[in-house]
């Protein structure tokens, strides 16, 4: 079974248990004869995907209990296997969604870590810097690189901590593993979105035929 999660920068694939990533240009050249079950948040690719006969869009099959307007299919898929907890998908944006008794209570969005860097560099050339991923969140910074890093990482940490209360935390996405390290009982699951997609196919076995 070949699954594909298409974002704005990359398309991530799971081929049985083999995970691989293509950038969007590579994805447009990608050819495969078997059925490809996908979700897509990239508006520019919608027409292209409609013309690919072996690409099956899973989005219409997700029945998700939420009153959130315009919730992205990637966020729905990431939350779909979680009954209780907070789901953090840390990519080009960081999305935080709160689930209780399989009901989506709401969520919020932050810039991704790489985009914080861009924001700082736009403010001033003096704020163009790499982040110190080892910066302590328990001591006030004494140099610019640490000050920028502290502002980003502590801000993200406190918002997630406040949303989580005592709920389990589930992290996914490119920076998910890094952010999960700030929390004692966090679970990092690189394949969380794919688990949601697999659950949909299991609920709709006719899709396989």
UniProtKB/Swiss-Prot annotation:
<dbReference type="GO" id="GO:0004594">
    <property type="term" value="F:pantothenate kinase activity"/>
</dbReference>
<dbReference type="InterPro" id="IPR043129">
    <property type="entry name" value="ATPase_NBD"/>
</dbReference>
<keyword id="KW-0479">Metal-binding</keyword>
<feature type="binding site">
    <location>
        <position position="68"/>
    </location>
    <ligand>
        <name>substrate</name>
    </ligand>
</feature>
<dbReference type="GO" id="GO:0046872">
    <property type="term" value="F:metal ion binding"/>
</dbReference>
<keyword id="KW-0547">Nucleotide-binding</keyword>
<dbReference type="GO" id="GO:0005737">
    <property type="term" value="C:cytoplasm"/>
</dbReference>
<feature type="binding site">
    <location>
        <position position="144"/>
    </location>
    <ligand>
        <name>substrate</name>
    </ligand>
</feature>
<dbReference type="GO" id="GO:0005524">
    <property type="term" value="F:ATP binding"/>
</dbReference>
<comment type="pathway">
    <text>Cofactor biosynthesis; coenzyme A biosynthesis; CoA from (R)-pantothenate: step 1/5.</text>
</comment>
<dbReference type="GO" id="GO:0015937">
    <property type="term" value="P:coenzyme A biosynthetic process"/>
</dbReference>
<keyword id="KW-0808">Transferase</keyword>
<protein>
    <recommendedName>
        <fullName>Type III pantothenate kinase</fullName>
        <ecNumber>2.7.1.33</ecNumber>
    </recommendedName>
</protein>
<comment type="similarity">
    <text>Belongs to the type III pantothenate kinase family.</text>
</comment>
<keyword id="KW-0963">Cytoplasm</keyword>
<comment type="subunit">
    <text>Homodimer.</text>
</comment>
<keyword id="KW-0173">Coenzyme A biosynthesis</keyword>
<keyword id="KW-0418">Kinase</keyword>
<keyword id="KW-0630">Potassium</keyword>
<feature type="binding site">
    <location>
        <begin position="5"/>
        <end position="12"/>
    </location>
    <ligand>
        <name>ATP</name>
    </ligand>
</feature>
<feature type="binding site">
    <location>
        <begin position="72"/>
        <end position="75"/>
    </location>
    <ligand>
        <name>substrate</name>
    </ligand>
</feature>
<feature type="binding site">
    <location>
        <position position="92"/>
    </location>
    <ligand>
        <name>ATP</name>
    </ligand>
</feature>
<feature type="active site" description="Proton acceptor">
    <location>
        <position position="74"/>
    </location>
</feature>
<dbReference type="Pfam" id="PF03309">
    <property type="entry name" value="Pan_kinase"/>
</dbReference>
<comment type="function">
    <text>Catalyzes the phosphorylation of pantothenate (Pan), the first step in CoA biosynthesis.</text>
</comment>
<feature type="binding site">
    <location>
        <position position="89"/>
    </location>
    <ligand>
        <name>K(+)</name>
    </ligand>
</feature>
<keyword id="KW-0067">ATP-binding</keyword>
<dbReference type="InterPro" id="IPR004619">
    <property type="entry name" value="Type_III_PanK"/>
</dbReference>
